[in-house]
C-alpha cells in the first residue's frame, strides 16, 4: 500500500491545484493521501473528483508557538466542518497576512515595490513566504 500523509497544494506552499495533486497521486499508485496544507483546509472544497480507489484523509499542518519557536504540527483525520476549528484557522490565516505585510514593508525598504499585491497573486487565500519568492522570481530578482 502506498501512503502519503503529508502533501501540499497551491492553497499553501505547493505547486499543484488540489485536483491536480489527486490526479498525480493516482498516476503514481498512491492508495491513501492526506492534503496537509499550511494553516488551511481550503483544498478540500476544490476537489471535483475523488477516485474510489483513493482514500483521502482530511488533514492540515498547523503553525504553533512552542518554547518561543514556531513549529508545525500535522493534524490527520480532522473534522473539516467543525466551526470552532474553521474559526481558529481563519485567525491563523489573518496572522499570516499580518506577517506578509511586515515582509512587504521590509522589501519596500529594499526598493521592491508592490510586493504584497505581487505575492497575493500567487497565494489565493493563504499568504506565505513562498508567495513572495514566486513574486521575486517573476521580477527576475531571484532565479531558481
Describe the role of every protein-language-model region.
Residues 1-69:
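An N-terminally biased module of ancient metal coordination in phosphate/nucleic-acid-related enzymes
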Residues 94-119:
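Conserved phosphoryl-transfer catalytic core
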Residues 142-144:
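Conserved small/polar residues in nucleotide/adenosyl-binding loops
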Residues 46-52, 61-94:
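Active-site phosphate-binding/coordination module
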Amino acid at each position: 500500500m502506498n501512503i502519503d500523509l503529508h502533501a501540499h497544494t497551491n492553497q499553501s506552499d505547493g505547486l499543484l491545484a488540489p485536483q491536480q495533486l489527486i490526479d498525480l497521486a493516482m498516476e503514481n499508485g498512491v492508495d491513501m493521501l492526506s492534503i496537509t496544507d499550511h494553516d488551511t483546509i481550503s483544498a478540500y472544497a476544490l476537489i471535483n473528483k475523488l477516485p474510489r480507489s483513493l482514500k483521502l484523509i482530511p488533514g492540515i499542518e498547523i503553525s504553533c508557538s512552542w518554547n518561543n519557536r514556531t513549529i508545525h504540527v500535522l493534524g490527520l483525520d480532522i473534522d473539516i466542518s467543525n466551526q470552532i476549528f474553521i474559526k481558529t484557522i481563519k485567525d491563523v490565516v489573518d496572522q499570516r497576512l499580518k506577517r506578509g505585510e511586515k515582509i512587504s514593508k521590509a522589501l519596500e525598504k529594499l526598493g521592491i515595490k508592490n510586493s504584497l499585491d505581487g505575492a497575493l497573486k500567487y497565494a489565493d487565500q493563504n499568504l506565505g513566504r513562498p508567495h513572495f519568492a514566486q513574486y521575486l522570481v517573476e521580477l527576475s530578482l531571484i532565479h531558481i
